[in-house]
A protein has these predicted regions:
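Extended, histidine- and acidic-residue-enriched regions that form the cofactor-binding/catalytic faces
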Residues: 1-105, 109-206
């Protein structure tokens, strides 16, 4: 059940039987010469939609722009400041809390969103405590990185091995292609598959 394709009476009927929602959250950033810029958001949305259909759970609109400042050298990439993303998530959830929802699972498609999303959860609870006190509903939020779930990890190890990597991976490119088969891109890649790399920070270059 997608919120954006539902009517308010349908949502009202849903709220009579459930207080949960799935929230896809991704990013709008480069994914190499053949990966769609919306890959992270597309994948999160596709996974959330499938899970929502299977479990009969409401799926909210996708948060399509996330924390992608490290991709801004590539045309088309978009980003939010951490403070902006935190407030977007806070207001998004609190809007739904006003209607009676209390359980939120964020289906995440971008690693750069983790810190800000987690901080937003604290912001949500703080705001509810400050504004409603003892009358605040028992709101609970959970972040799930779809690509790190046990089943997906096992499948990727079987199908892609060391070529899976951590960004613009075969699994996410394949899922985006499944969602948008009319937008499959090709590019001359050398090598065809990049091995998994390591994340570095300033300490590695001292």
């Amino acid at each position: 059940m997608l919120l954006q394709t539902s009517t308010w009476p349908e949502v009202e009927a849903y709220l009579a039987r459930s207080k949960g929602a799935l929230i896809p959250i991704g990013a709008t950033e480069q994914h190499g010469p053949m990966g769609l810029i919306g890959t992270d958001a597309i994948c999160a949305e596709e996974v959330a939609r499938g899970a929502g259909e299977a479990a009969g759970v409401l799926v909210g609109p996708t948060i399509s722009v996330g924390m992608s400042h490290h991709h801004m050298e590539f045309p088309g990439s978009m980003t939010l400041k951490p403070s902006t993303l935190i407030l977007v998530i806070r207001d998004y959830v609190l809007s739904l809390v006003d209607h009676g929802l209390e359980r939120f699972v964020f289906v995440n498609g971008h690693g750069g969103n983790v810190a800000s999303t987690t901080a937003a959860f604290y912001e949500i609870h703080t705001t509810l405590r400050e504004t409603r006190g003892a009358q605040a509903p028992d709101v609970r939020c959970l972040l799930v990185n779809w690509s790190q779930t046990e089943t997906v990890v096992e499948l990727c190890e079987k199908e892609f091995g060391d070529s899976e990597g951590s960004h613009a991976t075969p699994s996410e490119v394949a899922l985006a292609q499944y969602a948008y088969p009319d937008h499959i891109k090709t590019a001359a890649l050398d090598p065809q598959g990049a091995p998994a790399g390591k994340f570095h920070d300033a300490r590695n270059y001292r």
